[in-house]
């Protein structure tokens, strides 16, 4: 039986996918698998028996990926499971920036005791007038699951949409509307677009990408939307641009003291994926990925190990080896197994950066002696008997 610990409340729809072979427990130290949403794991001691961490969501900056990789702990996420929920809020944010609905609502609240509020509204409403998005230019930076949905929806709203992503996947490209203009240089988006929305992961190369230099290349009165990661924007630079009028509105899903309550900022309390549907979808996907890995050793949607799928093992045994991505590892594995007079019926080796993952189906059950011999090979992080 596999024991699973939840560091955050996880949707019952997802947990209901667990079979009788699984038990949800309160103590992470006894768990083979961990399900997490936003809880930080950076300061946690990871138990030796922990095999997998599944993030019910896309972002994994709350998980120590390198530390997990070195311990042979596979970290999964759920890309695309919350894409529609985030997309809808991005579109809502864009509409709120185009027309001062928030300001109008606040005026109504402040005027609640005015018996002639309807008459007063006719005089005051011009203060909250805005523009329509139809015919405007939207730049989408990052054409992953969310970016593609935002771009396609904006096309249906009658916007002229430009997309930038030098690493766009084949699947994303197939799903992208033909009406979206794919640009090869992000500065084309900066120069031409009325609205710019960013949908990229937080990396060293993307941190603070929306800064003073980037903003200087944008159209006057541009609207910036950030529903991806808070640190993608240098918000001090954004506030300076708001004061000068270079940026008309900054819409963010990440509340913090820098932008909260600032003129021109529409700050939402991190509601992007906070829908029942998104939480259910993320939980189901996270649970299914973890189950396939724990039961079969297959890796799908990992952020620290390569994808690998050998289906269900039909042989007597299956071994998974986590190791450095260096030469001569496979030769050493097969030599050790051969010395034990065990035949290998199938084998898969995949690498990702500095780490690699090898699965071997063998015609005899794996012995403790075999596991220890493989573990002694220099460069091996972990040896796991899957079956």
Give the positions of each predicted feature.
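N-terminal Rossmann-fold NAD(P) dinucleotide-binding loop
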Residues: 147-148
């Amino acid at each position: 039986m596999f024991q699973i610990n939840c560091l955050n409340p996880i949707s019952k729809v997802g947990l209901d996918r667990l079979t009788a072979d699984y038990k949800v427990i309160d103590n992470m130290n006894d768990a083979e698998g961990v399900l997490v949403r936003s809880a930080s794991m950076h300061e946690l001691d990871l138990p030796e028996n922990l095999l997998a961490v599944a993030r019910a969501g896309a972002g994994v900056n709350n998980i120590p990926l390198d530390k997990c990789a070195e311990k042979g702990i596979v970290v999964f996420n759920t890309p695309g499971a919350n894409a529609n929920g985030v997309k809808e809020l991005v579109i809502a944010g864009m509409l709120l920036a185009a027309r001062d609905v928030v300001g109008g609502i606040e005026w109504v609240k402040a005027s609640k005791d005015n018996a002639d509020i309807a008459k007063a509204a006719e005089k005051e409403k011009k203060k909250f007038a805005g523009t329509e998005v139809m015919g405007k230019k939207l730049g989408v930076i990052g054409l992953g699951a969310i970016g593609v949905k935002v771009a396609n929806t904006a096309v249906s709203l009658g916007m002229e949409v430009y997309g930038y992503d030098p690493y766009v996947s084949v699947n994303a490209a197939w799903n992208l509307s033909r009406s979206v203009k794919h640009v090869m240089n992000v500065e084309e988006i900066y120069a031409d677009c009325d609205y710019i929305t960013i949908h990229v992961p937080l990396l060293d190369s993307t941190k603070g990408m929306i800064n003073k230099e980037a903003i200087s290349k944008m159209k006057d009165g541009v609207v910036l939307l950030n529903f991806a990661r808070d640190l993608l924007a240098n918000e001090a630079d954004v506030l300076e641009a708001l004061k000068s009028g270079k940026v008309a509105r900054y819409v963010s899903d990440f509340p913090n003291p820098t932008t909260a309550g600032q003129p021109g900022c529409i700050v939402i309390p991190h509601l992007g994926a906070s829908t029942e549907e998104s939480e259910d979808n993320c939980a189901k996907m996270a649970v299914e990925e973890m189950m396939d890995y724990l039961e079969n050793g297959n890796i799908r949607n990992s952020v620290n190990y390569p994808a690998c799928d050998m289906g269900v093992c039909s042989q007597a045994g299956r071994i998974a080896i986590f190791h450095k991505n260096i030469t001569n590892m496979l030769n050493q594995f097969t030599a050790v197994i051969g010395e034990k007079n065990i035949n290998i019926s199938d084998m898969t080796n995949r690498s990702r950066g500095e780490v690699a993952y090898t699965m071997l189906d063998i015609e005899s059950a794996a012995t403790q002696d075999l596991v220890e011999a493989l573990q002694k090979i220099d460069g091996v992080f972990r040896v796991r008997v899957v079956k």
